[in-house]
Amino acid sequence: HNVLGHTGEDDAADYLAREGYHILDRNWRSGHKEIDIVAEKGGVLVIVEVKTRRDARFGKPEDAVSENKIRRIVLAADAYVRLYRIDMPVRFDIITVLGKYRQINHIIDAFRTPVWYR
């Protein structure tokens, strides 16, 4: 991870804590899959992908969350829920951190769990 990414994840975690979320894990890994932030609020497990950009010159940060990235996040979330035997609804959010003033945008319920045929 780079310094900018870590700073953005720190900003996102601080923001979530201020908003009443309980941070359960950061940079949780399952093989090659990673969850940036795992949080809980109101009985909902929230899986957060953080995207940090210096500027929007190459598009919005959230546009960098590809279908393949979503699949890896969902698989990591599945591993997390199974490992810790979590029995609560799961929501997937994206938090973007943009620019030198580190403007935060919290996209709640950013994507739904896709179903793949194997």
Predicted regions and their residues:
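Conserved catalytic cores of phosphodiester-cleaving nucleases, focusing on short active-site segments
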Residues: 16, 35-56, 60-61, 65, ...
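Short acidic/glycine-enriched loop/turn segments that link adjacent beta-strands
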Residues: 30-33, 101
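Acidic-basic catalytic patches of nuclease active cores, encompassing PD-(D/E)XK
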Residues: 1-26
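Protein kinase-like catalytic core scaffold
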Residues: 33, 44-46, 93, 105
